[in-house]
Amino acid sequence: GGPIIPELGILCSPRGVQSRLSSSHPNRVRPGGRPVVTPAPVIATRGDESWALACPGGDVIVQAVAQVMWRVMTTGASLQEAVEAPRFASFNVPSAFHPHPSADRLVYTEGGINEREREQLRAQGHHVEVWPNFEFDAGSVQTIRSAPNSQGERVLTAGADPRRLAYGLAR
């Protein structure tokens, strides 16, 4: 559940609080509006392959999912290797959650990101903070892929993120 506005008798969903009351804001509350909210599940397909990803993590969701997809597609990492790889997250834009804080040029990196890469971020003007490895706040990507093997048989593979309690099960 979410907060209750007793004077109006309205129960706000946890994601409903991501809307804005300012009439000029693109994510304003309005009749028929389609508010932007942070959940961002992904289904990707190519030929006989299909791939699904999802992640809890508020403002980090899209960043975490994109990093996992990038690792799989560009480095050939397995799904499990990709979800376990160190992450970074930017907090430069206003948070989706009230009171919508932002931190100019703030980037958090997990401990597994090497110091040389952190120095490169600092050289570009970022303020870099280091999270421990497998930081809860870095999101928790769960993923499963269905693809044919060399014999044309369907094979399911999964990745379960150790940052939170997660399992990869398929049938």
Language model region names:
Residues 1-134:
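Proteins synthesized as precursors that undergo proteolytic processing into mature forms
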